[in-house]
Amino acid sequence: MARPPLDQVRTIGIISHIDAGKTTVSERILFYTGETHKMGEVHDGEAVMDWMPQEQERGITITSTATVCTWRNHRLNLVDTPGHIDFTIEVERSLRVLDGAVTIFSAVEGVQPQSESVWRQADRYGVPRICFINKMDRVGADLRGTLRQMEEKLKARPVLLQLPVGEETGFRGVIDLLAEELITFADGDQGRTVSRGPVPADLLDAAREGRDAVAEAAADFDDAILADLLEGKDITAARLRGALRLGVLACRIFPVLLGSALRNKGIQPLLDAVVDFLPSPLDVPPAKGKRPGSETVDELPCDPGGPFCALAFKVQSEDGRKLTYLRVYSGTIKAGGAVWNSSRGCFEKLARLFRMHAHKREQIEEAAAGDIVAAAGLKEVLTGDTLCDPAHRIVLEGLAVPEPVVSLAVEARGVDDRDKLLPALEKLQWEDPTFRVHEDEETGQTILTGMGELHLEVVVDRLQREFGVGVKTGRPQVVYRETITRAVERREIFRAEHEGKVQGGEVLLQLSPLPRGAGVRVNVPDAAELGIGKELRDAVADSIGRACSAGARTGYPLTDLEVRVAAIPVEPGVTTDAGVRAAAGRGLMLAARDAGPTLLEPVMNLEIVIPADYAGKVLGSVQQKRGRIEGISSQGDTETIRASVPLAEMFGYMTELRSATKGRGTYTMEFSHYDRAPIEVLRRFGLEA
């Protein structure tokens, strides 16, 4: 595939709630662009983009997958992402490097909880989006209701570019409001043949009204269109597209298209919209980064002739080696070239470069600005690292990584498994920043922590399948947080003799509680203000951060407190980096123990969808779980319950809900916040109520 001009490149992702149809849309895109010659189906376990055995068995996407295809002479770098909240890091790291996104909504379920989550993630990164309302052929499809939910729940401004032709199972095509044409999709050739014709007479009034609404939205971004509207002049589709594109790039409007991916309807117009409305690498702001050891911010325009710079947004373990996914923001690099890893402070070699097609590789000789590629040979790299030209060193902003909330104890089944367990876990940690491993100091058990039960279930399954490691597991446990309830001050002095020489350190720490959700703030004045060297100052800051991660009483990380270093007295000939590290770490732990330590538990936002007949039974169950009902809504014979519930009460809830609703209830949940743990939990850890 020849390299197209940058204005003919679209680097996009497919994002949505689980089961809205992301992977089915992706499979149709690959089919209609000629990349595949057979439609892969999720329900048959044959989707190209869902290549992991765990994905094929469960019918869900677990890991983000990249591929490349072509439409209207434009290269589409396409990333399919998971919809389950347990794998939110895959969405996070994809959105970090995407220029645009297609958000899929189900016409039946509307805007679901994970739809809201991925929308917020895209907002945070400023990713322009178009929307595809899928499953228009399903009984209960509600276009107007979905648009209303987009406005109310997402605070978005949807601009409907199509009208449906036929309702529910009678859905057969769409009216293109820009071109003022009927679009239908042939049933006999899997939707390959797209026919355009005049708008049916009975839909002319609705089409004119819909086009007027589109023109009014476009007028907000083009004064000439506004003037023509006021004068009653006709406005061409090309002018409307140009104005709408400005609104999309500014993330102020979100064009909406319609279809049924499973029934092969609506995908080709969606591809046209990707080309027409979503940005090229030249349309997005330049990548920004800081020079190492400096606060100076540099901008990197997307220029193949500029200094090389790329972000490692994903690391995958393959046959014990790292395969690293890169988004190239500037410059060009050839296979075999050396780069500087600004995040690790070392040189790395890009031994080989690949263009990925799901899990299949196409070896390439070079990568340039605007590309998403995979590289073999990088040894030290981790997710979020910056790779750059050694002569132009820069550190790009990394990824926002959520904290894991569920833990699981594992132990090897046999002696052979014991030798393989930790190396296998290390490789899985390469891939997933939300997956953590540590050893329980009291029991010696290996503890896995992750984003949820399914997350850790998949990890254990991969240990057995991919690495041949047999493990026994305990019950999932909540990952609590420690915090303090009152302010304290502590002076800590450390002294030790090493090889006949006294080494020591002294710090004065002030701890104070912060509001819920504030995290940890470590306030260490500048070295000059403290009257010490920068090395000592940095040693104290690092030691305090590590001590906060280790906790004070229970081993759970500290949060929602401020640590201020008031003084670091220096005794010539005695004070050392190691000494002040020891004083700071021990001082923090002992100060927190004196500050009224308590535990916080994770609270989840829960959404339950059930037949109305079971609402009373399920509501009672939620309240018994210390849940707080946030709202109840009805749609036909279905009730949707929104509640906040402590995670500790939710283990095994799917089985309980299925039993209570005879298999007809479903639920989704995502992390909301931490709140005070109940008295029985505090007592279990020997803390005061």
UniProtKB/Swiss-Prot annotation:
Keywords: Cytoplasm, Elongation factor, GTP-binding, Nucleotide-binding, Protein biosynthesis. Residues 7-282 form the tr-type G domain. One of its GO terms (cellular component) is cytoplasm. The keyword Transferase does not apply. GO terms for molecular function: GTP binding; GTPase activity; translation elongation factor activity. The keyword GTP-binding applies. GO terms for biological process: ribosome disassembly. GTP binds at residues 16-23, 80-84, 134-137. InterPro entries: EFG_II, EFG_III, EFG_III/V, EFG_V, EFG_V-like, EFTu-like_2, G_TR_CS, P-loop_NTPase. Its main location: cytoplasm. It is found in: Cytoplasm. Gene3D superfamilies: 3.30.230.10, 3.30.70.240, Elongation Factor G (Translational Gtpase), domain 3, P-loop containing nucleotide triphosphate hydrolases, Translation factors. Catalyzes the GTP-dependent ribosomal translocation step during translation elongation. During this step, the ribosome changes from the pre-translocational (PRE) to the post-translocational (POST) state as the newly formed A-site-bound peptidyl-tRNA and P-site-bound deacylated tRNA move to the P and E sites, respectively. Catalyzes the coordinated movement of the two tRNA molecules, the mRNA and conformational changes in the ribosome. Belongs to the TRAFAC class translation factor GTPase superfamily. Classic translation factor GTPase family. EF-G/EF-2 subfamily. This is Elongation factor G 1. It comes from Geobacter sulfurreducens (strain ATCC 51573 / DSM 12127 / PCA). The gene is fusA1.
